[in-house]
Curated annotation (Swiss-Prot):
UniProt family annotation: Belongs to the bacterial ribosomal protein bL19 family.
GO cellular component: cytosolic large ribosomal subunit
Single GO MF descriptor: structural constituent of ribosome
Protein name: Large ribosomal subunit protein bL19
Keyword field contains Transcription regulation: no
Record function comment: This protein is located at the 30S-50S ribosomal subunit interface and may play a role in the structure and function of the aminoacyl-tRNA binding site.
This protein's encoding gene: rplS
Gene Ontology annotations of biological process type: translation
Keywords: Ribonucleoprotein, Ribosomal protein
Length: 118
């Protein structure tokens, strides 16, 4: 059980940040603040959510994208990080798994995910 002061601090952190609903299989575009020396810039990273883990302030999610020459790039982000500046869900994916680790072995058209129809 957490200390009540820590719990209230974490609740304030969560309430402060507005993050849209997303699941595994969704394609998202996030803006991450990068510090290079004294300069700051926002770098966008677009890919498929292959998993979420944790809960509360400690929650993280993993994004995978295919870069140049079909090389996969994965990044793990804390959900309530100060460096996340924007979060946009581009399309909803229709998947039946919580963790999409099988995508790591697939390339090209085999790595596509069907779009969820509403």
């Amino acid at each position: 059980m957490k200390n009540r002061y820590i719990a209230s601090f974490e609740a304030a952190q969560i309430a402060e940040k507005q993050i849209p609903q997303f699941r595994s299989g969704d394609t998202v575009r996030i803006g991450v603040e990068i510090k290079e020396g004294e300069k700051k810039r926002i770098q966008t990273f677009e890919g498929i959510i292959i998993g979420r883990s944790g809960n509360g302030v400690d929650a993280t999610f993993t994004i995978r994208k295919l870069g140049a020459n079909s090389i996969g790039v994965e990044r793990i982000f804390p959900l309530y990080s100060e460096s996340l500046k924007s979060f946009e869900v581009i399309r909803r994916g229709r998947v039946r798994r919580a963790k999409l680790n099988f995508l790591r072995g697939l390339k090209g058209k085999a790595a596509r995910i069907k779009e969820l129809k509403r």
